[in-house]
Swiss-Prot record:
Protein EC: 2.3.1.181
Name of this chain's protein: Octanoyltransferase
GO BP terms: protein modification process
Binding site for substrate: 72-79, 139-141, 152-154
Gene3D superfamilies for the chain: Bira Bifunctional Protein, Domain 2
Active-site residues (renumbered): 170 (acyl-thioester intermediate)
InterPro entries: aa-tRNA-synth_II/BPL/LPL, BPL_LPL_catalytic, Octanoyltransferase, Octanoyltransferase_CS
GO CC term, one of those recorded: cytoplasm
Pathway participation: Protein modification; protein lipoylation via endogenous pathway; protein N(6)-(lipoyl)lysine from octanoyl-[acyl-carrier-protein]: step 1/2
Extra remark beyond the main annotation: In the reaction, the free carboxyl group of octanoic acid is attached via an amide linkage to the epsilon-amino group of a specific lysine residue of lipoyl domains of lipoate-dependent enzymes.
Length: 215
Protein backbone atom coordinates (compact mmCIF):
# COMPACT_ATOMS: atom_id res chain seq x y z
CA UNK A 1 0.00 0.00 0.00
CA UNK A 2 1.49 3.33 -1.05
CA UNK A 3 1.84 5.75 1.82
CA UNK A 4 -0.57 8.66 1.71
CA UNK A 5 0.91 12.11 2.31
CA UNK A 6 -1.07 13.54 5.19
CA UNK A 7 -3.77 12.98 7.77
CA UNK A 8 -4.86 16.24 9.35
CA UNK A 9 -5.92 15.50 12.95
CA UNK A 10 -7.99 18.18 14.69
CA UNK A 11 -8.90 18.10 18.38
CA UNK A 12 -12.17 19.99 18.82
CA UNK A 13 -12.21 19.62 22.60
CA UNK A 14 -15.73 19.50 24.07
CA UNK A 15 -18.35 20.56 21.55
CA UNK A 16 -22.13 20.11 21.20
CA UNK A 17 -23.02 17.22 18.91
CA UNK A 18 -25.09 19.27 16.48
CA UNK A 19 -22.25 21.76 15.99
CA UNK A 20 -19.85 18.94 15.05
CA UNK A 21 -22.44 17.34 12.77
CA UNK A 22 -23.09 20.59 10.90
CA UNK A 23 -19.36 21.23 10.52
CA UNK A 24 -18.51 17.75 9.21
CA UNK A 25 -21.42 17.92 6.77
CA UNK A 26 -20.19 21.28 5.45
CA UNK A 27 -16.62 19.97 5.19
CA UNK A 28 -17.78 16.92 3.24
CA UNK A 29 -19.96 18.98 0.89
CA UNK A 30 -17.19 21.49 0.17
CA UNK A 31 -14.15 19.25 -0.13
CA UNK A 32 -12.41 18.74 -3.47
CA UNK A 33 -10.36 15.80 -4.79
CA UNK A 34 -7.26 17.56 -3.40
CA UNK A 35 -8.60 18.17 0.12
CA UNK A 36 -6.44 16.34 2.70
CA UNK A 37 -8.25 13.76 4.78
CA UNK A 38 -9.05 14.78 8.34
CA UNK A 39 -9.68 12.97 11.62
CA UNK A 40 -11.66 14.99 14.15
CA UNK A 41 -11.40 14.18 17.86
CA UNK A 42 -14.16 15.48 20.11
CA UNK A 43 -15.97 14.99 23.40
CA UNK A 44 -19.70 15.70 23.46
CA UNK A 45 -22.00 16.89 26.26
CA UNK A 46 -24.70 14.29 27.06
CA UNK A 47 -26.81 13.48 23.99
CA UNK A 48 -28.63 10.55 22.40
CA UNK A 49 -28.20 10.30 18.64
CA UNK A 50 -30.61 8.32 16.50
CA UNK A 51 -29.29 6.87 13.23
CA UNK A 52 -31.22 6.50 9.98
CA UNK A 53 -32.23 2.94 10.91
CA UNK A 54 -33.25 4.00 14.42
CA UNK A 55 -36.64 3.09 15.84
CA UNK A 56 -38.48 5.15 18.42
CA UNK A 57 -39.11 2.13 20.64
CA UNK A 58 -35.37 1.84 21.34
CA UNK A 59 -35.52 5.19 23.16
CA UNK A 60 -36.85 3.86 26.45
CA UNK A 61 -36.83 6.97 28.66
CA UNK A 62 -34.42 9.68 27.47
CA UNK A 63 -35.53 12.03 30.23
CA UNK A 64 -33.56 15.28 30.34
CA UNK A 65 -30.94 14.16 27.78
CA UNK A 66 -31.64 15.61 24.31
CA UNK A 67 -32.26 13.33 21.33
CA UNK A 68 -30.87 14.26 17.90
CA UNK A 69 -32.08 12.53 14.72
CA UNK A 70 -29.02 12.22 12.47
CA UNK A 71 -28.17 11.04 8.95
CA UNK A 72 -25.58 8.45 9.99
CA UNK A 73 -26.06 4.72 9.69
CA UNK A 74 -27.12 2.58 12.61
CA UNK A 75 -29.48 2.94 15.54
CA UNK A 76 -29.55 4.93 18.77
CA UNK A 77 -26.46 5.52 20.92
CA UNK A 78 -25.30 7.81 23.70
CA UNK A 79 -22.43 10.32 23.75
CA UNK A 80 -21.15 12.00 26.89
CA UNK A 81 -18.09 13.34 28.71
CA UNK A 82 -15.27 10.83 29.10
CA UNK A 83 -16.02 9.16 25.76
CA UNK A 84 -13.57 9.38 22.86
CA UNK A 85 -15.43 10.33 19.70
CA UNK A 86 -13.55 10.37 16.39
CA UNK A 87 -14.85 11.39 12.98
CA UNK A 88 -12.76 10.16 9.99
CA UNK A 89 -13.46 12.52 7.08
CA UNK A 90 -11.89 10.51 4.29
CA UNK A 91 -11.95 10.39 0.50
CA UNK A 92 -12.65 6.68 0.11
CA UNK A 93 -12.20 6.77 -3.66
CA UNK A 94 -8.70 8.16 -3.22
CA UNK A 95 -8.02 5.49 -0.61
CA UNK A 96 -9.52 2.84 -2.92
CA UNK A 97 -11.69 1.65 -0.03
CA UNK A 98 -15.30 0.62 0.26
CA UNK A 99 -17.52 1.31 3.25
CA UNK A 100 -17.04 -2.22 4.58
CA UNK A 101 -13.25 -1.76 4.31
CA UNK A 102 -13.49 1.42 6.38
CA UNK A 103 -15.66 -0.24 9.04
CA UNK A 104 -13.13 -3.06 9.31
CA UNK A 105 -10.21 -0.60 9.52
CA UNK A 106 -11.94 1.38 12.29
CA UNK A 107 -12.73 -1.78 14.26
CA UNK A 108 -9.13 -2.99 13.88
CA UNK A 109 -7.89 0.44 14.99
CA UNK A 110 -9.94 0.24 18.18
CA UNK A 111 -8.86 -3.35 18.88
CA UNK A 112 -5.19 -2.38 18.43
CA UNK A 113 -5.63 0.71 20.63
CA UNK A 114 -7.19 -1.31 23.45
CA UNK A 115 -4.48 -3.97 23.12
CA UNK A 116 -1.88 -1.31 23.92
CA UNK A 117 -3.58 -1.04 27.32
CA UNK A 118 -3.80 -4.79 27.86
CA UNK A 119 -7.50 -5.03 26.96
CA UNK A 120 -8.48 -7.92 24.68
CA UNK A 121 -11.38 -6.97 22.42
CA UNK A 122 -13.01 -8.11 19.21
CA UNK A 123 -15.51 -7.03 16.52
CA UNK A 124 -18.69 -8.97 15.73
CA UNK A 125 -19.49 -9.71 12.08
CA UNK A 126 -23.23 -9.22 12.59
CA UNK A 127 -23.12 -6.17 14.89
CA UNK A 128 -20.66 -3.35 14.05
CA UNK A 129 -18.60 -2.15 16.97
CA UNK A 130 -16.02 -3.57 19.37
CA UNK A 131 -16.72 -5.80 22.34
CA UNK A 132 -15.01 -7.10 25.49
CA UNK A 133 -16.51 -10.36 26.76
CA UNK A 134 -19.89 -9.59 25.14
CA UNK A 135 -19.94 -6.06 26.60
CA UNK A 136 -19.81 -3.26 24.03
CA UNK A 137 -16.97 -0.79 24.49
CA UNK A 138 -17.07 1.05 21.14
CA UNK A 139 -19.82 1.96 18.66
CA UNK A 140 -19.69 2.85 14.96
CA UNK A 141 -21.99 4.85 12.73
CA UNK A 142 -20.94 6.17 9.31
CA UNK A 143 -22.31 8.00 6.30
CA UNK A 144 -20.74 8.23 2.84
CA UNK A 145 -21.56 11.05 0.44
CA UNK A 146 -19.88 11.58 -2.95
CA UNK A 147 -17.39 8.86 -2.02
CA UNK A 148 -16.37 10.61 1.22
CA UNK A 149 -17.00 9.42 4.77
CA UNK A 150 -18.24 11.33 7.80
CA UNK A 151 -19.61 10.50 11.27
CA UNK A 152 -17.50 7.81 12.93
CA UNK A 153 -16.76 6.01 16.20
CA UNK A 154 -17.22 6.35 19.95
CA UNK A 155 -14.94 4.58 22.46
CA UNK A 156 -15.96 4.50 26.12
CA UNK A 157 -12.95 5.55 28.20
CA UNK A 158 -13.94 7.02 31.58
CA UNK A 159 -17.59 8.04 31.64
CA UNK A 160 -20.97 7.63 33.28
CA UNK A 161 -22.50 4.60 31.54
CA UNK A 162 -25.91 4.88 33.22
CA UNK A 163 -27.56 6.83 30.32
CA UNK A 164 -27.14 3.70 28.16
CA UNK A 165 -29.79 2.11 30.41
CA UNK A 166 -32.30 4.63 29.01
CA UNK A 167 -32.00 3.14 25.50
CA UNK A 168 -31.54 -0.14 23.69
CA UNK A 169 -27.96 0.62 22.56
CA UNK A 170 -27.62 0.21 18.80
CA UNK A 171 -31.08 -1.35 18.81
CA UNK A 172 -30.18 -4.34 21.02
CA UNK A 173 -32.35 -4.84 24.08
CA UNK A 174 -30.31 -5.42 27.23
CA UNK A 175 -26.94 -4.89 25.53
CA UNK A 176 -24.39 -4.36 28.30
CA UNK A 177 -21.85 -1.57 27.88
CA UNK A 178 -18.38 -1.31 29.35
CA UNK A 179 -15.49 1.17 29.38
CA UNK A 180 -11.73 1.23 29.78
CA UNK A 181 -12.00 2.48 33.38
CA UNK A 182 -13.74 -0.73 34.43
CA UNK A 183 -11.13 -2.94 32.78
CA UNK A 184 -7.87 -1.41 34.03
CA UNK A 185 -6.23 -0.79 37.41
CA UNK A 186 -5.33 2.74 36.32
CA UNK A 187 -7.25 4.63 33.65
CA UNK A 188 -5.28 6.60 31.04
CA UNK A 189 -6.36 10.14 30.25
CA UNK A 190 -8.64 10.78 27.30
CA UNK A 191 -5.78 12.62 25.59
CA UNK A 192 -3.48 9.61 25.95
CA UNK A 193 -6.08 7.31 24.40
CA UNK A 194 -6.72 9.82 21.61
CA UNK A 195 -3.01 9.88 20.75
CA UNK A 196 -2.82 6.10 20.71
CA UNK A 197 -5.90 5.80 18.52
CA UNK A 198 -4.54 8.36 16.05
CA UNK A 199 -1.28 6.40 15.73
CA UNK A 200 -3.10 3.13 15.19
CA UNK A 201 -5.51 4.67 12.68
CA UNK A 202 -2.74 6.28 10.63
CA UNK A 203 -0.78 3.03 10.62
CA UNK A 204 -3.82 0.96 9.65
CA UNK A 205 -4.73 3.16 6.68
CA UNK A 206 -1.17 3.88 5.57
CA UNK A 207 -0.81 7.63 6.16
CA UNK A 208 2.82 8.74 6.09
CA UNK A 209 2.45 11.71 8.42
CA UNK A 210 -0.08 13.20 10.82
CA UNK A 211 -0.51 16.78 11.84
CA UNK A 212 -2.31 17.32 15.15
CA UNK A 213 -3.81 20.63 16.17
CA UNK A 214 -6.52 22.06 18.36
CA UNK A 215 -9.39 23.81 16.66
Amino acid sequence: MALLPLLDVINLGRQPYEQSWQAMTAFTNQRTPDTPDQLWLVEHPPVFTQGQAGKAEHLLFPGDIPVVQTDRGGQVTYHGPGQLVAYPLLDLRRLKMGVRDLVTAIEQTIVATLAEYGIESYPKPDAPGVYVENHKIASLGLRVRRGCSFHGLALNVDMDLSPFLRINPCGYQGLAMTQMRDLMPETPSLVQVQEQLVCQFARKLGYETCTMRAN
